[in-house]
Amino acid sequence: MAKKVKSKVDTINTKIQLVMKSGKYVLGTQQSLKTLRQGRSKLVVISANCPPIRKAEIEYYCTLSKTPIHHYSGNNLDLGTACGRHFRACVLSITDVGDSDITSA
């Protein structure tokens, strides 16, 4: 039987779910910008259909605070679902990774 190969989306989804269970995070653009300004954010995940003006602002603050950015390949509904929520989320800011190794992704 052939080996089942996980896609990159599946692995990032499982890492996000592990952060939701064991780490600390913030959902939303305004709260994510707040954690970036305070320097508490370890990783920022941006959905593919995030508005360009918001994406540019978040990327600007990420470069100032030297925070890595991950561009999520799914839309904001997919990112919200990966976080275990039933609503859309354009931006996810991870402040404590917990047991996950998402920062090495």
Swiss-Prot record:
<keyword id="KW-0687">Ribonucleoprotein</keyword>
<keyword id="KW-0689">Ribosomal protein</keyword>
<dbReference type="GO" id="GO:0003723">
    <property type="term" value="F:RNA binding"/>
</dbReference>
<dbReference type="GO" id="GO:0003735">
    <property type="term" value="F:structural constituent of ribosome"/>
</dbReference>
<dbReference type="InterPro" id="IPR039109">
    <property type="entry name" value="Ribosomal_eL30-like"/>
</dbReference>
<comment type="similarity">
    <text>Belongs to the eukaryotic ribosomal protein eL30 family.</text>
</comment>
<dbReference type="GO" id="GO:0006412">
    <property type="term" value="P:translation"/>
</dbReference>
<dbReference type="GO" id="GO:1990904">
    <property type="term" value="C:ribonucleoprotein complex"/>
</dbReference>
<dbReference type="InterPro" id="IPR004038">
    <property type="entry name" value="Ribosomal_eL8/eL30/eS12/Gad45"/>
</dbReference>
<dbReference type="InterPro" id="IPR022991">
    <property type="entry name" value="Ribosomal_eL30_CS"/>
</dbReference>
<dbReference type="Pfam" id="PF01248">
    <property type="entry name" value="Ribosomal_L7Ae"/>
</dbReference>
<dbReference type="GO" id="GO:0005737">
    <property type="term" value="C:cytoplasm"/>
</dbReference>
<dbReference type="InterPro" id="IPR029064">
    <property type="entry name" value="Ribosomal_eL30-like_sf"/>
</dbReference>
<dbReference type="GO" id="GO:0005840">
    <property type="term" value="C:ribosome"/>
</dbReference>
<protein>
    <recommendedName>
        <fullName>Large ribosomal subunit protein eL30</fullName>
    </recommendedName>
</protein>
